[in-house]
Amino acid sequence: MSQEIGIFADILQTNKDKSLYMKSFLKSFFSVMIIVTACVTIFSSCKTEEKYDFVFDVPGQITAAFGAEIVIPFTAENITSISVASQPKGWSVVDVDMVNWTITVKSPTAFTADDSSVEENGILKLTGYTSIGTIVYATSYLSLLNQQIDFTDAYSNCYVVCQKDTRYTIDVTHKGESENRITPADVKLLWQGPKAVVQYCSYDSAKGEFTFFVGHEDITNDDKEVVDTRMPGGNAVVAAYDDNGEIIWSWHLWLTGSDVEASAIRTSAGDFMDRNLGAYHNGDGSVDGDDIYKSYGLYYQWGRKDPMPRPIDYSFTKNNDEYVYGSSDEFIRWKYYDDEDGAGSAEFAAANPLAFVLGSKSNDYDWLYSSHDDTLWSADKKSVNDPCPRGWRMPAGDAFTAFDIDELEDMAQLGDVKGMYGWHLVDRLTGVKMFMPGAGRRSFENGVLTNVNNYGDDYSPLPWIGYYWTAGTAGSKSTSLFFDLNTTRAVNNNYEPQKQMYRANGMQVRCVRE
């Protein structure tokens, strides 16, 4: 009996040991699973938060030389290796320097128009690999150009850009055409309109030069097939910055359809440009909306070099500005300042080219708040603030007294001339004509665009009016050309060649040859 009890006790002890073993095993298993889960979670978290950066320092590289080696800097963080994913035909990658973060590219050694083995332009694509194997791409535009224009010896506040598919270089160490020199810490594209008409910008601080590229726009037929290309139209402003990131000067890039030198109009009052400053062309009285719009130039407050944008379309829809963009394609808005914003000085205006300075009532609606400065523009000697390109200047205060509205247009029926949005002016001495668009003005009170005369009503405002600044002054005001379209008066259309206006108004400019 005692033997049977012992056997039974052994069985119980064995089962107890097995139970304890299973408990220990399960406890260990779940502990391991918890640890594994924690490790997976940590690893997953680390992977999600992986930091890296791989980008070229400038978006594009342009060379005018065959077989040239170009050293392109790039920024890389947590990139352990790099390979070339693709490159334009005929281009080669000579070296990838992982110490100094540069890549050396060689342009094609030869090129002909029918050579399919060479691409004049294209994208260089690099593949970067992070420490845990993440793949990252960086791209840069490469272009081999035979066309380049150097403006560095012809420094000015405004540069006429009228050749497509060309690299341009400008001086960024002079204020206007003066010998007043600056040393910018940086130079960048401030705004442009339309988007991406100015590309691949770079600043060479050692030379004090800024380089940019202007391509082309396609011309298509009715079947949307590209049949040709042309110079793109638009405007841009480039700004120089000091070490604190403050603007110290800026320059206007005027992308226009043809050479303004070749198309100048000779009159008894001087040689005038055939188009407004900032316009693509002169519509010459066309009633086509696109032609009218391309005839509109930019707007300037009297005495300032800084251009302000056109309306969004030729008919001034809701008086809205055209869209303009920054260097990263962000939308840019102008700011409107009054005497409570610390504005109202020439220094403030130069440092804030995106500012419309509202007129000060206490100073007779000048954008200068404590005085008037008649020397900001001059017809005798081109001033540092003159907005016209080199070789051109603001017209004298009496320049438009030599003209009048073309008689046939002046006497025509309203329906025959309303759609022209402007008048042909006739030189009374020589009979030479030039068309002046009625592009309105920006109000000195609020900066808003307006292009209606005073003779419509609230429900049916009637276009149009023309205001053009001259360099002339009269007391606290400045001299402008004014004309309008007669819609209700029993007299001919209004033409005032020396109308005195508040200096805070924004008006069109028609430059005259020096």
Region spans (language model):
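Short, compositionally biased
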Residues: N146-K382, A474, R503-E514
